[in-house]
Amino acid sequence: MLIDQGQYELTILIWLIIAISTFILLMFIRAPYGRHERPGWGPRLPSRIGWIIMESPCILIMTVFFGFGVTKWSVIDFTAITFYTMWIAHYIHRSWVWPARARITGKRMPFSIVFFAVAFNSINSWINAEWLYSLHHPYPSSWLYSPQFVIGFVLFLIGMGINIKSDNILFSLRHDGKTDYKIPNKGLFKWVSCPNYFGEIIEWCGWALATWSLAGLSFAIWGMANLIPRARSNHKWYLKNFSDYPVERKILIPKIW
């Protein structure tokens, strides 16, 4: 335990205030990476390396806390193993699989974006790991059968499936090795511009339910604070750059927005 319960809850409160402020800021300023990358944001590095650097702390920090937790076990803690597996499954894909598959050779991102992403991922991973394997450890073994865990776990899997499936559709648009952007028309892309973000939001809402914690809730809120403005920017970008883009297609939530 690095801090007591009161200090931890105060940290999350401050973290949530920053999330809301970030949401407001990103509604007016497009984060300069990917299709929105532009000069004026300082030194840049290869995008593939940047992605690996900025996402890998999530694996490292959670693994360190999980490892220390294992040393205290008197019996196998299946709940702790399940939460660790959920987290690591997402971040192995996000940190290593996605950058390896993405057609981003030759593309670059600002070092400042990598720096802020490392800071966010480190703090967010610590908040969740501290709760799971220190402050609240252990969850009872019966937790895996509780309604909140079962519903949350199912949502997590559904969201992860949508996220990966949508990424695969985007990858398939560049199977010829070209890096030009194209209009995706398969899967949930028929209804929204950013189903990959929609899936990730569902995923972390599921995590919040499954852990039934302020840590999980703060991550879900942060996910929305980052991905909702990003989805809006991507949708506007499609409309601006493709004259034949389906005008009836929503931004993030099918049939709604």
Segments (PLM) and residue ranges:
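Hydrophobic transmembrane alpha-helices
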Residues: 2-25, 64-65, 69, 75-76, ...
